[in-house]
Curated annotation (Swiss-Prot):
Cleaved signal peptide residues: 1-22
Membrane topology category: Multi-pass membrane protein
Alphabetically ordered keywords of this record: Membrane, Signal, Transmembrane, Transmembrane helix
GO cellular component: membrane
Transmembrane segments: 84-104, 107-127, 170-190, 197-217, 236-256
Predominant place of localization: membrane
Species of the source: Danio rerio
Name under which the protein is recorded: Transmembrane protein 41A-A
Length: 281
């Protein structure tokens, strides 16, 4: 009971912090509107509600591509004068999702590509993914170990058996689980402290193992921000970027799978129900 109270307190505190960031926004860039004489004048009090006046009501986790596009446009608007605040808001929202195992990080990865570009967006999402997963690890270690075992006894037992079988190659086993596209990352994050996986090993496996997945999402966001029509989608530059993305994403996984077939004991991972849909990653 005490562990549940502690977890609820952490969730409430984090939610209040994130809500405060989204509501008490700094003033956005000065808006202008066209007068009847053709001159540009500043928007004044009493005018129709501007974009920045309704911004707080539009800041929410995107659940589809339309909401994602609207969110990207709004944050790009604020980013022109408040880059630091937008970065703080994005990082806070990302860590909130990861720490509490909330699905939908792919949308935030795409948003990172649209806001910050491919390379900075990739570095940012890799760091945030790793830190957020580690926070989930620590929360599970502090508050949830007993409840997770109670809720998922068979899956925990099966994963515990596989970890012990691959203890001599534990890092590569963890990399395999992260590269494997159907592995539920939220479940791996929460069960790792139960399996006695060292936090440093966990940290490195998440950072490296989810890098290809993050790269695909960030590159998609970066490309979408540059595409204005369907014709742009089939340009040579876009096609080459897609091919490069596919190669970079598939190569590490192929190498790990080749290693795993020779050195790791993986029988039963899929048949015991560990695999799940990609959207729950």
């Amino acid at each position: 009971m005490r562990s549940l109270v502690g977890l609820v307190a952490v969730i409430v505190t984090a939610t209040f912090y994130l809500y405060s960031l989204s509501v008490f926004l700094p003033p956005g860039p000065q808006l202008h509107k066209q007068s009847h004489e053709g001159e540009t004048t500043d928007a004044k009090d009493g005018d129709e509600p501007s974009e920045m006046e309704t911004a707080s009501s539009r800041l929410k986790f995107p659940s589809d591509l339309d909401e994602l596009k609207e969110m990207a446009e709004l944050l790009q608007f604020y980013k022109t004068e408040h880059t630091g605040y937008v970065l703080l808001l994005f990082c806070s929202a990302y860590l909130y999702k990861q720490a509490f195992a909330i699905p939908g990080s792919s949308f935030l990865n795409i948003l990172a590509g649209a806001l910050f570009g491919t390379w900075f967006g990739l570095l940012l999402t890799c760091v945030l993914t790793t830190v957020g997963a580690t926070l989930c690890f620590l929360l599970s270690q502090a508050f949830g170990k007993h409840h997770i075992v109670k809720l998922f006894p068979d899956k925990v037992a099966m994963l515990q058996k596989k970890v012990e079988e691959n203890r001599s190659s534990l890092f590569f086993f963890l990399l395999f689980l992260r590269f494997f596209p159907m592995s539920p990352n939220w479940f791996l994050n929460m069960t790792s402290p139960i399996l006695n996986i060292p936090v440093t090993l966990f940290f490195m496996a998440v950072f490296i193992g989810l890098m290809p997945y993050n790269f695909i999402c960030v590159q998609t966001g970066s490309m979408l921000s540059q595409i204005s029509s369907l014709d742009d989608l089939f340009s040579w530059s876009v096609v080459l970027k897609l091919l490069l993305t596919a190669c970079v994403a598939l190569l590490p996984g192929a190498l790990i799978r080749k290693y795993s077939t020779r050195h790791l004991h993986l029988d039963g991972l899929e048949t015991n129900g560990l695999s799940q849909n990609k959207k729950n990653r």
